[in-house]
Amino acid sequence: MTTQTITDEKLSHQVSINIPFESEKQASIACNSLSPDLILRSTELSVSCRSSDRNLICEFSGSSDRVIRVAISSVIDNLKTIIECMDEFDAKEDVIFTEA
């Protein structure tokens, strides 16, 4: 599933990130949750997200490395909130690691 894709020759910087999830459903939920976010400056940035198996794949194209860095930071902040919501609604207890 692609959330938003804009092709422009000026978008010469590109980065792709792959975020693994516990299940295919979680990756799909994350992808769908990111889809409403519109890019305000589409001439400077393109972001596309899709889920594949248990992975969320986000591809960024931008006019500069700074633009991409800010976009990635924003997506990661949004993903943090999405994951916290999934954890809360899933009702799983936190795993606490102890030394053996």
From Swiss-Prot:
GO process terms (BP): tRNA processing; tRNA threonylcarbamoyladenosine metabolic process
Predominant location: nucleus
Keyword Transcription listed: yes
Short name of one Pfam family: Pcc1
The keyword Nucleus appears for this protein: yes
UniProt entry keywords in alphabetical sequence: Activator, Chromosome, Nucleus, Telomere, Transcription, Transcription regulation, tRNA processing
Membrane-spanning segments: none
A Gene Ontology cellular-component term: nucleus
Entry-linked InterPro entries: CTAG/Pcc1
Location within or outside the cell: Nucleus; Chromosome, Telomere
Protein family membership: Belongs to the CTAG/PCC1 family.
Protein task: Component of the EKC/KEOPS complex that is required for the formation of a threonylcarbamoyl group on adenosine at position 37 (t(6)A37) in tRNAs that read codons beginning with adenine. The complex is probably involved in the transfer of the threonylcarbamoyl moiety of threonylcarbamoyl-AMP (TC-AMP) to the N6 group of A37. PCC1 functions as a dimerization module for the complex. The EKC/KEOPS complex also promotes both telomere uncapping and telomere elongation. The complex is required for efficient recruitment of transcriptional coactivators.
Binding partners and assembly: Component of the EKC/KEOPS complex composed of at least BUD32, CGI121, GON7, KAE1 and PCC1; the whole complex dimerizes.
Protein name per Swiss-Prot or TrEMBL: EKC/KEOPS complex subunit PCC1
